[in-house]
Amino acid sequence: MNDIGIEIEQLNMPSITSLENIKYIKALGGTYGEPGHSLTGTTPFNSRNFKQEKPAIIYISEISHNLNNKSYFYGGGYYRRSGIKNVLVGKYTDKLKQIEVVPPQLDNIDYYFEAKYKANIGDTVIGAFRTQIFVTRSDVVLIEGLKYDRPIISAVYDSLGRIKYKYKGVKVKNE
């Protein structure tokens, strides 16, 4: 742009900003890095390296129905390139089963996942994958206090980041 007479004062670089590549943003003249998945520790770099950043998001759903000895659960906000392989399913944390997931078709965004196991309807599903929250009808629940083993729900947001509920110290039930 400078070559054609347009002065650039700010250069916002694309997503996947992380501690690993922020030095390159600076070296390339970038003044901003899109936070995106760096806030949740779910950049492609984080799938193999947790030295500097740890994933800070989990996906919670429930088994909605069964068909032909397989279970299905809602997967709103799934990012089709995330490579989900397994989820944990069950009623109690000490009895969760690791279940293989059949990823949905690439052209879907809010849909049901198929789990290769017949679980109980209503069982909790816990997954970890790269999300696209802004294109879903799902909510985001902020939980604080995990570092101190005292989790509390502090707020619920819609997919556009608007606050739906704000809580003061609601304790998470830990069975």
Model-found features: residue ranges?
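Active-site loop/helix belt of alpha/beta enzymes
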Residues: 1-49
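Short coil-to-beta-strand transition motifs
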Residues: 53-60
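A residue-level signal for beta-strand positions that form part of recognition/binding surfaces
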Residues: 30-32, 60, 70, 124
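A general, composition-driven signal for non-globular sequence regions
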Residues: 46, 59, 110-114
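A generic structural signal for short, solvent-exposed coil/turn residues
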Residues: 3-5, 55, 105, 119
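C-terminal accessory subdomain/extension
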Residues: 68-175
